[in-house]
């Protein structure tokens, strides 16, 4: 099938730039959500692999690429991100309360997907999360686990007012560094670097506003008690959608403790740990990811 690009304007005024593959009349519908600091193009190969039997849509979430970029960080709170996804699902399925077959999400896209699955489970038949912490687990680990607190220190840099300028400096050197902990990885080809550069050149503050809007960040000092006082109601963390979690175990930002006790919030969750893969498992081991997604789609 041929990749298509389009803009989807939602009823509440937000426009999402989208990429899609697969026939419009395919028997299955799949939506794929990006993570920081990427963009929807990272799903192109995945969509091509699934397209023979599925209509796949990968939106750039608000704040990313050519999608609407509200200036106020408050516009990136979960209720607004979930509203975007609910409206996109309605536009994709042809009506409200019609579910998609599979929602696939990585990193910040996973944050949106966890919230949607908790608040509107009727819209998703199956969920696949890729290296994205459940909000309840993230709160617990940021509050109680020194290893995760240390691993998440980078968040404090992302919320700085000058973060966009700092990350854009020297041809986005700091952003490219997030993709390549020990030197440029083999998957980060010159063509892919050019795609990242083109997206980042359209603005970074929208993507950074996800971090600015979130209360889930490590304490800034022993006196910082914000996380101790934060309570997430069960209604926003309990997920009753069949869920598969794919997890690259060499993720230096998201430590393994984030998987502990996940079944308490997500009954029946299936967890596939992948040794030797990092946060960027979709790029590092695409064949393995494709197979897990095909399995999830076949189970619907």
List where the protein language model places each region.
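Charged catalytic carboxylate motif
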Residues: 42, 84, 206, 288, ...
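Short conserved AdoMet
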Residues: 51, 266-267
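Active-site helix-initiating loop/hinge in glycosyltransferases
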Residues: 35, 77, 284-285
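Conserved HGGG/HGGXW glycine-rich cap/lid loop of the alpha/beta-hydrolase fold
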Residues: 21-69
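Flexible "cap/lid" subdomain of the alpha/beta-hydrolase fold that forms the substrate-access gate
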Residues: 2, 16, 22, 57, ...
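Short, hydrophobic alpha-helix immediately C-terminal to the catalytic nucleophile
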Residues: 44, 114-118, 290
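Catalytic histidine-centered segment of alpha/beta-hydrolase-like enzymes
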Residues: 277-286, 290
